[in-house]
Regions:
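Metallocofactor- and cofactor-centric catalytic cores in central/energy metabolism, strongly enriched
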Residues: 1-244
Length: 244
């Protein structure tokens, strides 16, 4: 069943001939779906709508404002009713459905007597693995050999919300707080993947002891150390990152 679900999702992403995104047909209210059909904006697939929008807006292609707007709407629906819904469901399947919780936030979450690690970006698998690893008795014992009382994990930006809503891990802040977090002088390690990562954090980190680790092959930074995250060796790589 898991394989069938995964292949259906992949087909919704990359379908090139006919059809439409399953989520649009199955989840949208009937009246909403009828309205989409009327205007011809039901997404065919996620990738296809994005590529077509880029083609139409290239120099000398589509010059009709209303026509461009309709494709913009179809692309937006592909993003929301395709990409966002699929990624949300996959994350819930893999890591569990979030529940309302109480948690802390802001820079007060950092602890002077523990190793402060911050996960930052948008890929929940990396954050989940680091969460698992920092709670391993062996890793906690390792931190104590370095003079710390333990490991304190925090989040930044969207990844922060993933581990907050599922595990109660506090968030250090949002997009505009990443450099300020380093300026506290308390962040020992900042591990990042993709999106919303300011390039200046490596320059700021040089003024402190903070290590910045990039993990995605698509997103490297000058001044950061790169440890590529591989889902097939997730725990092993997460341990390596935490031990930095």
């Amino acid at each position: 069943i898991a394989k069938e679900v995964a292949l259906t999702f992949l087909n919704d992403f990359g379908r090139q001939q006919g059809g439409q995104i399953n989520y649009a047909a199955k989840r949208a209210p009937k009246k909403t779906l009828e309205r989409w059909k009327k205007w011809g904006i039901i997404p065919r697939s996620i990738d296809r709508e994005v590529v077509e929008m880029m083609h139409r807006t290239n120099i000398g292609v589509d010059h009709e404002p209303d026509h461009l707007l309709l494709q913009g709407l179809r692309t937006a629906l592909a993003d929301g009713w395709g990409g966002s819904m699929i990624s949300t469901d996959i994350t819930d399947i893999l890591f569990g459905t979030p529940k309302p919780i109480q948690a802390e936030g802001s820079f007060g979450i950092f602890k002077q007597d523990e190793v402060n690690i911050v996960v930052h970006g948008h890929e929940p698998l990396l954050a989940e693995m680091i969460y698992d690893v920092v709670n391993e008795p062996e890793m906690i014992a390792y931190s104590k050999t370095k003079g710390a009382k333990g490991i304190n994990l925090g989040g930044m930006c969207c990844t922060a919300n993933e581990i907050l809503i599922r595990h109660g891990i506090p968030t250090a802040g949002g997009f505009t707080n990443q450099e300020l977090g380093i300026l506290t002088g308390l962040v020992d390690l900042l591990t990042v993947d993709v999106q919303c990562i300011m390039p200046a954090i490596t320059q700021v980190s040089k003024k402190f002891h903070t290590k910045v680790i990039t993990t995605n092959y698509r997103a490297k930074m000058q001044g950061a150390e790169h440890i590529e995250f591989d889902e097939h060796h997730a725990k092993e790589i997460a341990r390596r990152i935490v031990k930095m």
